[in-house]
């Protein structure tokens, strides 16, 4: 029997780790561990930021790594706050995120998740796995346990991410879609 491949997921967020482990739980040969690593905050487009963070993490840890970068993008603001949503959320909270759109009629937006994976071998490309979910920015509803989930309502649903069961959220969310793409990659590489 082959040994399990350990991949370091660079996060200090236990909720994110749990979500990733739940989604990839069927993989018998992959072990996802959490490594809280302080990486530089790169500026730029989501794909570029993800690649830079993953390459730096792989260099520091000398092995296979997985990083996740999430954006919340408002259509009225040309995609902002985008990859900078973390900083807005820390300063404003979910209520402030919603109030950012006070001056606009258009409250539509999308959540974008990018997982970047490096096998840890120098010279190999960083691979990206993306998921996107269209929705509306609404007044916060539901538990405040997971970032901006209380103010994002996916199209076709009457609940915010925060009000949904984890099973439903994982099946439709930007992160769930990105994890599905990642899972398919590991299946193709016979890592499960």
Curated annotation (Swiss-Prot):
- Enzyme class name: hydrolase
In short, the EC number is 3.6.1.66
The entry marks the following residues as binding ITP, namely 11-16, 53, 69-70, 86, 146-149, 169, 174-175
Reaction(s) catalysed by this chain's protein = ITP + H2O = IMP + diphosphate + H(+); dITP + H2O = dIMP + diphosphate + H(+); XTP + H2O = XMP + diphosphate + H(+)
- CC cofactor: Mg(2+); Mn(2+)
* Cross-referenced SUPFAM superfamilies: ITPase-like
Where do the annotations place Mg(2+) binding? 41
Q: Which Pfam families match?
A: Ham1p_like
Q: Where found?
A: Cytoplasm
Assembly and interactions? Homodimer.
Sum up the protein's function in the record's words.
Answer: Pyrophosphatase that hydrolyzes non-canonical purine nucleotides such as inosine triphosphate (ITP), deoxyinosine triphosphate (dITP) or xanthosine 5'-triphosphate (XTP) to their respective monophosphate derivatives. The enzyme does not distinguish between the deoxy- and ribose forms. Probably excludes non-canonical purines from RNA and DNA precursor pools, thus preventing their incorporation into RNA and DNA and avoiding chromosomal lesions.
Q: What is this protein called?
A: Inosine triphosphate pyrophosphatase
Provenance organism:
Ciona intestinalis (Transparent sea squirt)
